[in-house]
Amino acid sequence: MTQIVFVHGMFQNPKSWDNWVRYFSDKGYDCSAPAWPLHDGDPKALRDNPPAGLGELSLDAIYASIKSAVAGLDKPVVIGHSVGGLIAQKLLADGHVSGAVAISSVAPNAMLDFDWGFIKNSAIITNPLKGDEPVYMDAKTFHGSFANTLSEEHAAVEFEKTATHDSRNVLRDCMGSSGKIDLSRPHEPLLLVAGEKDEIIPADLNEKNFKAYENTGSVTDFREFPNRGHYICGEPGWEEVAAYIDGWLQQNRFDVDNRIYAPSAI
């Protein structure tokens, strides 16, 4: 049975994957959704009482935690959203997984885009004047940037269910050495997924990320979904995205006996 590990991104926790875990479990996959450090629990409780040390959380600490969760499994597939998508790409590059899906992924190697939404949101999060003060997510910001394709009322419901506060240092680290990946090396299958109306990670940046992979002998695919925002995994129509990914997994025959190359080749 193929194992799937779902990795959430900033301002979310494993709660955001509940529908996906059910969907892929019903398809016969063995699914898990580990929390980042300081992100386990009910999102509202985490918002009301932010964990001590949240503002100091680093990408390296998150990666180490997720890598540890993956290490106890049998070369799973990893599906990650946003920063979770970058973590998925790093796990793939480091040879820890048999395949990866990066949804609305933060791009490696400090790749940038001149989209105004991307610039604005990145600047707010990484503001150096804020030091280690966490980013406090609120319903208005969640609707304006994260769930911009939803109505204000629907976004408010999703905010209550899934939103958390987060560490500025995570995105800062993504832009530094911790976010670097050697894109010239061979890798096992990778799918990058983008949302047309994403205000946080523009589809153009996801496509740029896709085109930066240089090894023509490795499977690297890209799919953009129309009318989707950064909340692509939770907004109406998420089932279409999940079904496409399921089809891609089947097409690439994901199990540990059908790897493109042995780990020793990495």
Go through each PLM region and give its residues.
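Flexible "cap/lid" loop of the alpha/beta hydrolase fold
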Residues: 96-130, 169-176
